[in-house]
Regions:
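N-terminal signal-anchor transmembrane segment
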Residues: 1-54, 70-77
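Membrane-interfacial loop-to-transmembrane alpha-helix junctions, especially the N-terminal start
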Residues: 3-15, 53-67, 109-115, 205-208
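Transmembrane alpha-helical segments and their membrane-water interfaces
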Residues: 45-51, 76-133
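Membrane-interfacial entry segments at the cytosolic side of transmembrane helices
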Residues: 107-116, 204-207, 242-255
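Alpha-helical transmembrane segments of multi-pass inner-membrane proteins
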Residues: 113-137, 160-221, 226-239
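A membrane-periplasm/extracellular boundary helix in multi-pass inner-membrane enzymes
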Residues: 125, 129-134, 240-287
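TM-adjacent membrane-interface loops and short helices in multi-pass inner/ER membrane proteins
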Residues: 286-311
């Protein structure tokens, strides 16, 4: 009976984790409808908040935070064109995160990392095949996959439950997400926990996870993902000076050296660097953050600052 309870709890938590990360841009919200997905996450979150009476002090503080977040969103809605659905959408995310953690706090991080690991492994394999044989090598299965909206006269993406074939980013690994930037956020989170929480897994498992997360992050060709890798590695090497985990430190150093050699000495690595760095901020011969996707970010930041200054 105890085994059945543990197994059921494990399955439920994996399901909650999948739905939790689906809110970051996977296909499930669009497949069942965004409004239905918001209602689903709210009900799932509320169910486990009310069902289990553990973590009382944490729950009291966290629910207070969610309540304050919801009412602050309502104040924004009153003075804008946003709807109540926006407030529910924003508050449903921290609620489902807390409920997922509360199901089994002791195994939450391990299961989160394992699920991301298998998603990353699948994405690396499928992305490698598309790079070798072409994006259309899977065209025969596209009609059987979930199709997203149309953009520029063609379907934006196919799939999205475990892997997504995104036509706009056919040369980048988006994982099950609609954009590589969304995917790198999840990968960077998993990489952080596996690097800075050594007690979660044995050393061999950690090395295996780190290598897969590194490879997946590199193939996203996400500038923010590359910046995240640099920051995580720099902080880890400083942190590891006080630890005795020599094997992990050497594994990361070897991975970094291998990545640098790949980027600098292979044609594919040079293409990656051109996509991530030069085409985004250095295309006109000088440093310019207004180019391509960098422009979308800097323009929005400058617009917000201008609005604050004028009002």
């Amino acid at each position: 009976m105890n085994y059945i309870h543990k197994y059921t709890t494990c399955i439920i938590q994996y399901l909650y984790i999948y739905i939790m990360i689906s809110s970051a841009g996977m296909a499930l919200p669009a497949y069942i409808g965004n409004d239905n997905f918001i209602i689903l996450t709210l009900l799932m979150g509320i169910y486990y908040v009310l069902k289990k009476k553990t973590l009382f002090h944490l729950q009291k503080q966290y629910l207070l935070f969610i309540g304050c977040l919801f009412f602050s969103m309502l104040l924004v809605i009153i003075g804008s064109t946003l709807s109540l659905g926006t407030a529910l959408s924003v508050t449903s995310i921290p609620l489902i995160i807390y409920a997922t953690y509360k199901i089994d706090p002791a195994n939450y991080l391990q299961r989160f990392i394992k699920l991301i690991f298998y998603i990353a492994l699948i994405s690396i394999i499928l992305f490698t095949i598309t790079r070798i044989y072409g994006f259309n090598s899977f065209s025969s299965i596209f009609p059987h996959l979930y199709t997203s909206f149309f953009r520029g006269g063609e379907v934006y993406s196919y799939g999205g439950f475990l892997y997504r074939f995104v036509t706009l980013h056919s040369d980048r690994n988006c994982g099950p997400f609609s954009e590589p930037g969304q995917y790198q956020c999840v990968l960077s989170s998993a990489l952080y926990f596996i690097m800075f929480h050594p007690r979660l897994f044995e050393a061999k498992e950690r090395i295996r996870y780190i290598i897969v997360f590194f490879l997946a992050l590199i193939t996203t060709l996400s500038t923010s993902g590359y910046i995240g890798i640099v920051i995580l590695v720099f902080c880890y090497l400083l942190h590891s000076l006080k630890t005795i985990d020599k094997r992990m430190k050497y594994a990361i150093i070897i991975t970094i050296i291998g990545t640098m050699l790949f980027m600098s000495m292979t044609k594919l690595g040079n293409e990656f660097m051109n996509t991530v760095v030069f085409h985004k901020i250095y295309a006109n011969g000088q440093l310019d953050f207004s180019l391509n996707s960098g422009g979308a970010r800097t323009i929005s930041i400058s617009s917000v600052l201008t609005t604050i200054y004028n009002h």
